[in-house]
UniProtKB/Swiss-Prot annotation:
Positions that bind ATP: 31-38, 639-646
GO MF assignments: ATP binding; ATP hydrolysis activity; DNA binding; excinuclease ABC activity; zinc ion binding
PROSITE patterns recorded: ABC_TRANSPORTER_1, ABC_TRANSPORTER_2
GO BP of this protein: nucleotide-excision repair; SOS response
One Pfam family cited in the UniProt record for this chain: UvrA_inter
Disulphide bridges: none
Lineage: Bacteria, Pseudomonadati, Pseudomonadota, Gammaproteobacteria, Vibrionales
Record-linked CDD domains: ABC_UvrA_I, ABC_UvrA_II
Protein species of origin: Vibrio cholerae serotype O1 (strain ATCC 39315 / El Tor Inaba N16961)
Protein role: The UvrABC repair system catalyzes the recognition and processing of DNA lesions. UvrA is an ATPase and a DNA-binding protein. A damage recognition complex composed of 2 UvrA and 2 UvrB subunits scans DNA for abnormalities. When the presence of a lesion has been verified by UvrB, the UvrA molecules dissociate.
Subcellular location field: Cytoplasm
Name of this chain's protein: UvrABC system protein A
Zinc finger (C4-type): 252-279, 739-765
GO cellular component: cytoplasm; excinuclease repair complex
Annotated ranges, domain ABC transporter: 309-586, 606-936
Amino acid sequence: MDKIEVRGARTHNLKNINLTIPRDKLIVITGLSGSGKSSLAFDTLYAEGQRRYVESLSAYARQFLSLMEKPDVDHIEGLSPAISIEQKSTSHNPRSTVGTITEVYDYLRLLYARVGEPRCPEHQVPLKAQTISQMVDKVLELPEGSKMMLLATIVKERKGEHVKTLENLAAQGFIRARIDGETCDLTDPPKLELHKKHTIEVIVDRFKVRSDLQQRLAESFETALELSGGIVVVAPMEGDGEEQIFSANFACPHCGYSMRELEPRLFSFNNPAGACPTCDGLGVQQYFDPDRVIQDANLSLAQGAIRGWDQKNFYYFQMLTALAEHYDFDVHTPFNKLSKKIQEIILHGSGRTEIEFKYINDRGDIRLKKHPFEGILHNLERRYRDTESNSVREELAKYISNKPCSSCDGTRLKIEARNVFINDTALPTIVELSIADALTFFQELKLEGQRAQIAEKVMKEINDRLQFLVNVGLNYLNLSRSAETLSGGEAQRIRLASQIGAGLVGVMYVLDEPSIGLHQRDNERLLQTLTHLRNLGNTVLVVEHDEDAIRMADHVIDIGPGAGVHGGMVVAEGNVEEIIANPNSLTGQYLSGVKKIAVPEQRTPKDAKKTVELKGAVGNNLKNVDLSIPVGLFTCVTGVSGSGKSTLINDTFFKIAHTALNGATTATPAPYRSIQGLEHFDKVIDIDQSPIGRTPRSNPATYTGIFTPIRELFAGTQESRSRGYQPGRFSFNVRGGRCEACQGDGVIKVEMHFLPDVYVPCDVCKGKRYNRETLEVRYKGKTIDEVLDMTVEDAREFFDPVPVIARKLQTLMDVGLSYIRLGQSATTLSGGEAQRVKLARELSKRDTGKTLYILDEPTTGLHFHDIQQLLSVLHRLRDHGNTVVVIEHNLDVIKTADWIIDLGPEGGQGGGLIIAEGTPEDVAQIEASHTARFLKPLLN
């Protein structure tokens, strides 16, 4: 079987297509956004491959796996088990890091446990096992005549009553033991609590230190070591003298610091054996941040410098008034004019000083009470800790920030794990290195003799995995980077690297635009990785718009000709030459150069007086960057992956602007020195790829605000007025007009254990979401359900006489979404589509010409033709006087920009500098810029 046969695929918008796909080849599926590429790749081929594999398992195993819906297809032959690597961002678990996802960290733990050298944290000397004679000598160094006892640890911090243990010790002839620090008689031991942790140490010998004790001590040590498994404690019998720990395992000769045998879990921050006890292995501590609590330091306490403690909140404000009387300050003085001492007292409390507070109840009775003032920060902490209301907790969480844990300095590990070294390098140092530097470290690491032999296999696994990460262009990440902070493209390429590491053969991989977020420079390495997967003997199916990927494919499938209802057919298939030769293929026309995105004749000139100047940005890897953005221009921020684009624009510039222009209270920008020029804008809008709604009830009509005027139109018809229907009657989210059998969903979810949940159309409303009475109301001959089922294109014509609706529909068409249905569930929109719905919503708002738009990789999921449409929209925004800032790798976008800011020169620590800025023509001349190298040929 050397091909996959697909017959009659009708998933989503696919129009009963038949396909023959070669196996063990690199296949690229391309076409307009929304043409049906993902429906073919993910919802048909992957879903069926996955479903068949899962159905071969037992019913018991199936209940733990999420099953795919059976695709609407007549039959598929020649499928392999399928693995999909999608754009979904990875886990939201704060414990997930790049190291743990890629399994590199597991091998590092094993390596450190097997060949690491533990050291004493205080004296930095290697921990060595002590012989009995060394132990005896150490005891004899104590002052002559000291009364000491020698103890063997039998139970350490373990729950239970330990009756048997104590009986055994007595039977062996031991008389006394120390239990939880108290000495007691073994003939009558205390009863221990079952659910508490206990430590039991048996007293092997009691002696006064004398020089002739050698023989006796040696025998006692031998007995004790045998009982305890290698650790003996020598403690004074009277007073609080210091105890000495001796170890036949590992111990520091200076201070007796010792530790148990090294094992991999000691280096895991997800295991109590290795996690820092202060932060539980998270590396950060949460605290109420004064900068967030103080809303505006220029205001006085009475005016609301601290939200929730102003005059409107009588209970809390009377506390501040009493505080002001006691310390003699004025609640009407601006907060930043109060002395440092007073500010400290307000935030952190009055310590032990008691203050007289007046409490007035509802009846107006006054009660006087004297007690210390707890401080606003402690008050918030207490309320956060004690509340059972989620809404209160969410509200208070806005004032919380994270700081590196004070005990482990953010390394997440216990002190023992932080002090194990391989050639003077500890594990936390390695996970902080970039992946490229870590690879160099392990390639150059030289171990001696037996250690080299033990480490050989583990090192090979570590090197291979790091090499794969470098190959997919992630050399700039470090292993300790939290998975939450990765972009969709990075997360996908990490999963890709893990798959190559698995080395499977005969599998069908389905990938969704792996080139997202990758600079042209790194694209080549990614494509080599894909061909490597193919050469292992796998079928690699890639949904991709990148020209290099299409040209490199063994087989290209072009889906189209349009998007949505106008798509769903195979327009062209074959190798690249066949696609180019096919006159029907839009992709072919762009590849051959018949159609192309032109370089603009002239660019909008920069007005030197109108710029935004951000100085001294130092977030993440930024090296004191000064950013200057021209107002009223279309600016592209470029640079290799990891060079600092997102940190500079999203984490610093956008958050400052969001706070200053939109009044956001919880956006904390990355550190910077100063900013000037925001007065040129009245608002800032950030348009990203996150979903527009996570429930099937959210749809383009509700999101863009078209649904409200549509419901008002229906409520205004003669029929509605005679029945007394309000606009709410036409909402499927509230009781009244919706079908109650399915609560306005149109479908009913039937849970099938062991099989995927089945959604069946509701029998009562036949999937129309509304009850019969509501559907009797028609506007221009259409019911509300028929309107929701219209495509944007049809609705634009239908509502042409209604300007408020027509304008919003026109903007949806302008961003290339003419094919989506008004009532289409938000969960079925791709990332690129969701971003364009957001863009359309912003475009349809009244345009002041003073808006700052920030877009992060808007070309994700877009075909050449879609990019052309997107650019005309962005250029239109700019022509109205707005400022557009785009983070982008796509050269078609970069070459049409008015201004480019290029970061680099490399990713990670090798980046964080602006290395070129100016018009595309200026930037193309700069040698140091990787972007320039690829941009230059396109401008000539």
